[in-house]
Amino acid sequence: VIVGMAPWNAPVILATRALAMPLACGNTVVLKASEACPATHRLIAEILLEAGLGEGVVNVITHSATDAPQIVERLISHPLTKRINFTGSTHVGKIIAETAAKYLKPVLLELGGKAPVVVLDKANLEDAVNAVAFGAFFNQGQICMSTERVLVDDQIADQFIEKLIEKTKSIQAANPLQGNYPLGVL
């Protein structure tokens, strides 16, 4: 059994990612749903069951935020749990790592990193600028894989910076549900 823990801020893609590899390798999975979006995580399991995956292959546990520490401890300590996959904050990741270490369980942590983009001198500047802007501002930058550092070859740095400034000035912030606004207001 693999325990997967996915966050709220990209619930479909990150829960699917927590399930895909363990399932492809023939494992069953217990997905600890985020307390902020349990219905989304449960829906993924229901879709997989409807698609013929089989009863008990993907199991979803929902809980309140106050119960999270006890649920995590029990999932990790369970004798059938062989590995843990966690995507989320560095703070909670440290707790997961400590708990997994206590039970000698391997753990994969995908935490709030410093996701870099490297732009080489042969890059198409328009494409690079669009990729950096998307990576930095998609989901208002509130995802673990948001672009946080940009390393640009000295030969094109000035041009890149100029184009990135132009791009950021053109991005409108508003409610994404009310139009084509890639940057929502918090």
Regions found by a protein language model. Give the residues of each.
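ALDH superfamily catalytic-core signature
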Residues: 52, 67, 89-186
